[in-house]
């Protein structure tokens, strides 16, 4: 029962980033309730790479906090543990944490959990799906000792 993490740091400045142990803990919290064996790549990038990927895959010409690329296993291959890749933009995460008055650690954890749920097939396009996904995010954040990441989104 384990999640294998391939952490890639592609940021020009890697100081102040969460540790590999932190990323592993956040990933385990989000993935293990659903999948006993998994492999996930988390790539930490700067704005230029995030912008390029966001434009290429989503048609949006701006960097974004997290992009999720689920692995699509061919039907003839069974029980392949590769879950997918998360691309997280350091500058966007740092800017959002400041704007939303969240601790940087809390926001990093939330981005890993949010992205991991996308890899597992969760989405937030429809209201009902969004509620289910947000409930899981809140539960996992609480498990890790972090506050509700959506508490200030309610009006």
Curated annotation (Swiss-Prot):
Family per similarity comment: Belongs to the endoribonuclease YbeY family.
Localization in the cell: Cytoplasm
Taxonomic classification: Bacteria, Pseudomonadati, Pseudomonadota, Gammaproteobacteria, Aeromonadales
**Residues involved in Zn(2+) binding:** 114, 118, 124
Gene3D superfamilies in UniProt: Metalloproteases ('zincins'), catalytic domain
Q: Which residues form a coiled coil?
A: none
State the source organism's domain of life: Bacteria
Q: Which GO terms describe its biological process?
A: rRNA processing
Q: Which cofactor does it need?
A: Zn(2+)
- InterPro entries in UniProt: MetalPrtase_cat_dom_sf_prd, YbeY, YbeY_CS
NCBIfam families assigned to the protein according to its UniProt record, in alphabetical order = rRNA maturation RNase YbeY
Q: What is this protein called?
A: Endoribonuclease YbeY
Please provide, alphabetically and separated by semicolons, the GO molecular function terms listed in this UniProt record: metalloendopeptidase activity; RNA endonuclease activity; zinc ion binding
């Amino acid at each position: 029962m384990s999640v294998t993490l391939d952490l890639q740091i592609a940021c020009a400045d890697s100081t102040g980033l969460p540790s590999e142990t932190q990323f592993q803990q956040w990933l385990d919290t989000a993935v293990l309730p659903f999948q006993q064996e998994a492999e996930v790549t988390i790539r930490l990038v700067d704005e230029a790479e995030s912008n390029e990927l966001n434009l290429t895959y989503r048609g949006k010409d701006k960097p974004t906090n997290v992009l999720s690329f689920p692995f699509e296993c061919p039907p003839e291959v069974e029980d392949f543990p590769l879950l997918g890749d998360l691309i997280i933009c350091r500058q966007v995460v740092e800017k959002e944490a400041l704007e939303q008055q969240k601790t940087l650690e809390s926001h990093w954890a939330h981005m890993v959990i949010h992205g991991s749920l996308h890899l597992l097939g969760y989405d937030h396009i429809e209201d009902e799906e969004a509620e289910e996904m947000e409930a899981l995010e809140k539960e996992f954040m609480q498990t890790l000792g972090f506050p509700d990441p959506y508490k200030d989104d309610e009006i």
